[in-house]
Amino acid sequence: MRTAQITRKTAETDISVEINLDGTGTYDNLTGVGFFDHMLDQLARHALMDMTVRCAGDLHIDDHHSVEDVGIALGQALTQAMGDKRGIRRYGECVLPMDDARVACALDLSGRPFLVWDVEMPTAKIGTFDTELVREFFQAFATHGGITLHLTQAAGVNSHHIAEAAFKATARALRDALEVDPRTADAIPSTKGSL
């Protein structure tokens, strides 16, 4: 079973993450940052990844440390749960519309982290949430998950819709990339023999 449990404790945050890559998309995420919890729920549900996240962070300062550190821990959990990546499809892509917004995600579970972020939020806030933290999450997640991750916005005027489209597109692309291909279930998806 492709599962992982990660704990990460610093002077700024105390985080636990549990994931099951072969789940049904159940989730129980409590970070103290309401909008971010909503985005994590979307990631779990649309990737069909069971996910439980707990974060106690220094929210009296701002949401930055909590959002970034959850991205770090979730990326570490993904890496652990994938193991040697035997049998996975490795690549995934999705163009996802959400009302006015359309965001494309293309990713490679290559072990070579890289983020291409071509997304612009028209507002600085979604409620009390700083929109710049969406990129911070994806940077941390890609770096610690070993993901080459490209997110490109083609349309959108509503920051909530743009952010949610980015999370959902990433989830759908992850779902495809993590799926085991029955034709190559015993093989590493690389001519190098490892990822």
UniProtKB/Swiss-Prot annotation:
Entries under InterPro entries matching the protein: IGPD_sf (IPR038494), ImidazoleglycerolP_deHydtase (IPR000807), ImidazoleglycerP_deHydtase_CS (IPR020565), Ribosomal_Su5_D2-typ_SF (IPR020568)
Q: Know the name of this protein?
A: Imidazoleglycerol-phosphate dehydratase
Q: What is the E.C. number?
A: 4.2.1.19
What domain of life does the native source organism fall in? Bacteria
Q: Which GO terms describe its molecular function?
A: imidazoleglycerol-phosphate dehydratase activity
Pathway(s) served: Amino-acid biosynthesis; L-histidine biosynthesis; L-histidine from 5-phospho-alpha-D-ribose 1-diphosphate: step 6/9
Record's GO cellular component terms:
cytoplasm
The record, for NCBIfam families, names: PRK00951.1-5 (NF002109), PRK00951.2-1 (NF002111), PRK00951.2-4 (NF002114)
Q: Which organism is it from?
A: Jannaschia sp. (strain CCS1)
Q: Name one GO biological process term.
A: L-histidine biosynthetic process
Major site of localization recorded for this protein? cytoplasm
The beginning of the lineage is: Bacteria, Pseudomonadati, Pseudomonadota, Alphaproteobacteria, Rhodobacterales
Which residue pairs form cystines in this protein?
Answer: none
Per its UniProt record, what Pfam families does this chain match?
A: IGPD
